[in-house]
């Protein structure tokens, strides 16, 4: 329902992202993308509404008739009514009657259960349907299989009564521009789906309101003023919520309100305004303000907590269902550039300024640093637990420092003296994080002081950048760790949670902390590591400014939302000392933005800076002219105040500089002196009449190179075992390439079940030859199309049910058989080495009818060569087919030549890089992180890195066959 995209949207005509993201690739949505999400309002030149045209996945174009929102359809007397409306209204009336009939003590628990049921039906039920529709077109396939939309006159519809019911219901609701028989099946399916949505959403809202009524009461000893304030705030929030919903529906219309783009797309020009300029995902963020307003009016913590649960479930729905569909539908990776399409600069990028491919001078002088003004590729990022690397001094220091702070906080008493020390420590670190770090960035912006220091000692700008990231990271960690320690010392556990506003303060405080965490994550997702660490202070980035993510709505989210958690701590502790720290933090953060960030942005981008963000513009539009003038006057006062402060600082700067220089010299001299999953196997009972001899599987694949066979005789065997293998037959071992597609030919009786399927398993996973007892984990393909309600299991079907006449069979059998072919590739393969088999299963169950010959997937170990140039070329030659297989041989991802760049999907989906590093490790004995593959970008760069790594590791290798990572080598 919340179809206003808030991330990865490019707004080129408005300029700024308050910190430029030079090294991060930005996904750009086409107008069709925003159109399809429903942020549209099509008008002709005269301002009148025009017809809307829809487009189904198969390219069918149709007229989308005008429809109305659910409330109007149900309650407006001017709208036509049908049986489904009566059913919905009857169910809503039953809810109200139940509240009236239940005894007082049962109302709250009963309606809590009812509301949670409808909320689960919304987020889990509708979410499951939409997820499957997005990935497998399940709802449309159900309609196709049941043929409920096929005219019974054709004789193909086994459910004529259902057809007549749907036809009457839908044509009653849409009297103009709609014909049930002529509309595409996707559109009819969507119309039926939205009737289900109407029922669930209306029951969800009504049951919530009834639950709030059941819980509502007047608090004991509450003053009249507090009651008036509570109800006034609640009413304001509800009215604001109502405006958000109405304005959102005005913008997105019914198409996006009912998730129409899961079924079809519409062709329209777009407008992007209203509530979608105010907040990301307004339907799911600020669109739930009314829940908290109702909680205030009900004066019930039960209503508040169930509102929080509902809000959290809605965000889970957004993250798990809507966002993946948006990315898949509207953010496809850009097409990969071929070698012929690349510019000369791209082809010759591996020159002296490349950290990957060395020049001959670099070969002669191995320690000569390379200098580049371009931002470095981020391979080993700092932020996030998943990037924690204890081999890195920055991460080790961070962990040790946090452990030390935690230990001191827990082990010391909470006496006034220790409380003062911890608060003072937090204040000092906040001063350092804002003023100290700000001073260094100011010097870097104006004089490149930080970079000059490292260049002075022969280091590269990249080294200066890495050291800066470590310094900033440690400063940030100490700032917040010391603040948390001070909060811990000042916090007193409540003796009575029901006293006064204690519980409310904790709930609001936790909410503000969560808001700051979400804001920080959103900022990092928008800026990337380069922007997070102020990379445009160190490298010349792009002069083009873009707004995406949270910056579409706010110029500086750090200004308010970025410190919400600090004020949450104030609410939780109710401490004057923590209030002082919060004020100090906020003032210093505002000063940092005003005196450090803004001047640098103005110097880099000048007039292209955006003055008002989306939220500010929306608020200004809603203000009367007099208040707009007042807003301008206030802005002028603030600007003049900041200019006055800047003049004072400029006057005092020489004295401060002398003092700082003396302090630095003295300090320098001083330092120089000192789950388990359960799988249930379903056994079919109708196997009678099927002969397993009529079933067979034949496997074909790309044979592995001869390098894989060299390990069969390693010298570790006995004398007899070293002899050539004596085969009593003409069948050789099946050894296939890693990641190469595998073709499976099957035979079965003519009357085999259309729901038969073939799965891929490790040989050691199944002890039974009759029943498969482990999950295929998605590695299966149906033998016939249309048998299952998803499309994934049909990917790989080549042909099905080709009849083999009795005279065509080689084994003398006189029965006709059916045959077919499927191809296992990509995610349907095991991306590891081992011995595997295919199993043919009967009728969507796990009864095994045939098992293929076992086959081995093996990665051949690379043989060393002495000459470096030959090694470089041969490594490239060996890597290219492996990498193509790792990239599913997709022409949009996999390179055709060693100098072609990888497709952009390699950066977005980490599985491809992980496949490559596993293969490289097995082939060459060198272990890389997946980010290395993404950063290298071509087979040639990766081959050079492999050769260089092997030369570096050669002195430490204990392998007689060449360099490898010693501790990882397994014999």
Swiss-Prot record:
Membrane topology: Multi-pass membrane protein
Gene Ontology molecular-function annotations: phosphatidylethanolamine N-methyltransferase activity
Key words of the record: Endoplasmic reticulum, Lipid biosynthesis, Lipid metabolism, Membrane, Methyltransferase, Phospholipid biosynthesis, Phospholipid metabolism, S-adenosyl-L-methionine, Transferase, Transmembrane, Transmembrane helix
Topological domain ranges for the Lumenal compartment: 1-85, 131-195, 245-277, 322-389, 442-473, 518-575
Record-linked PROSITE patterns: SAM_CHO2 (PS51598)
Annotated function: Catalyzes the first step of the methylation pathway of phosphatidylcholine biosynthesis, the SAM-dependent methylation of phosphatidylethanolamine (PE) to phosphatidylmonomethylethanolamine (PMME).
Similarity annotation: Belongs to the class VI-like SAM-binding methyltransferase superfamily. CHO2 family.
Protein name: Phosphatidylethanolamine N-methyltransferase
Taxonomic lineage of the native organism: Eukaryota, Fungi, Dikarya, Ascomycota, Pezizomycotina
